[in-house]
Amino acid sequence: MSTKTQTTTTHYAIQKKRRAEFIEEWRNYRQTVIRQEDVRLEPTARGLRTGVYMGWDGDRPTRCLDALVHEVDPGTTSTMHRHSWDAILFMLDGSGWTEVDGVRYDWKTWDAIHIPAWSWHRHGNDGDKPGRFMSYSSEPMLWTLGMSLIEDAGHAPFATLPPRPAFSGGIPGNDPYSRRLRRLAQETKKRRSGRIHTPYDEQEILATPRGTRTKFLNDRAIGNEASGLTQVMIQFAPGKTQSLHRHPGEAWLYVVEGYGHSFMGHSPDQGEHHRWKKGDLIVVDHFLWHQHFNDDPVNQCRLVRIHMFDSILETMRTLMDPMVLFEEAEDTLVSMQELSQIEWPDDKRPGE
């Protein structure tokens, strides 16, 4: 017997109330700087120690991407698992290896790795000190769509595990279904053939008009085929800053070296200053003007910037046009002549 829901409230009233409650809830989740000392690492069933900077599982919910830190002890091999989302890793300290679909990638400090969706992967450490790395994933985005799935296979060898989900190949024809099959097959093949490992020394760091030097760690420009996740190393010369700009969230900046502060405000001249140091995570989680400063007059500082602009922001820009979603204060940009006068520290990993 079928039933019919009875309500005397209009859909307009229901949605208006729900939307008001939703935005108020998320305003209460907003963050600025997550301190390293506030992130507690705990042993996990995978054999790692893990802490959450940003994400549902650390009681700091997000919409697009998360930020976690992991440690793998000497002689340890984690369990093998896979998930419906992708992730990027940044290696903070020590050395180790990550196996992706049966291929081992040895890494050391400041290397980066992309973990494609549905790829079996695990981590290990053959060294004599713990390896430490950050992970940033698109899981929150998949969660909003009801498509977050994870599968842990324990210590089963890769050769015994099922492959990534199968897909139908393209077929001839110009009808909508044939065209969809070909389009999706082509995209899937491309996504499954991207770069996995980026050794830090492989890319050159270059000066930009924003007043800093940068290099890609993960990005489609260097061959990664991610969900839009990108990762860039930003080097600040002593006492220098980056140009003032704004864009929608979410974007994280992990403090790799040094100390400084960030301005964040709803207008270029009205906001607050937030101090940070090595190991902290700077959070830009909504549409704010922001600018980052190296407060050390003698030494460089380094931030690693992470966001999903290639997918989330580009979609938002398309849907919101002609509203401008990425702006820079042009009077804070640096000329090429000014850039040439900056004395940049060498671009070397720790210990080199």
Model-inferred region functions:
Residues 212-213, 217-220, 229-233, 251-253, ...:
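Eukaryotic modular interaction domains in large regulatory/scaffold proteins
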Residues 77-109, 119, 246, 250-278, ...:
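A short beta-strand-loop-beta hairpin characteristic of the jelly-roll/cupin
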Residues 1-63, 151-228, 331-352:
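A short, N-terminal "cap"/entry segment at the start of jelly-roll beta-barrel domains
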Residues 88-90, 114, 128-148, 252-253, ...:
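A short hydrophobic beta-strand segment most commonly corresponding to one strand
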Residues 6-13, 250-256, 262-267, 272-352:
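C-terminal functional regions that serve as terminal interaction/effector modules
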Residues 57-62, 78-85, 104-106, 119-120, ...:
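Short, low-complexity cationic-aromatic patches
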Residues 73-75, 100, 107-127, 133-139, ...:
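Conserved metal-binding segment of the jelly-roll/cupin
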Residues 49-56, 66-82, 232-248, 286-287:
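Conserved short histidine dyad/triad with adjacent acidic residue
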